[in-house]
């Protein structure tokens, strides 16, 4: 399975700067699987629309940031009168799903790829 976007597209067109090439490949694969599920696999792999590629890049970054948050532990930290709060993995996952769906609707909402009817 090929990813819907490659690293060159991520850098040059999406203008992404968060992920390196190796990380992008991992997260773009996860984003591609999510997009295939949400579009009922209607994207033609031989002619991938820019909206799909942009959405793939966007969701790749969102997934990376969620993974980073899972491993950092602290959601916020205060130095004066030291205070730390933690975000649960469930909250991080819920936020990722919400942000991914928002990206999906923003990029693909007018393409017909999300249509669930006959």
Please describe what each predicted stretch is.
Residues 1-118:
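Divalent metal-cofactor coordination and adjacent catalytic microenvironments
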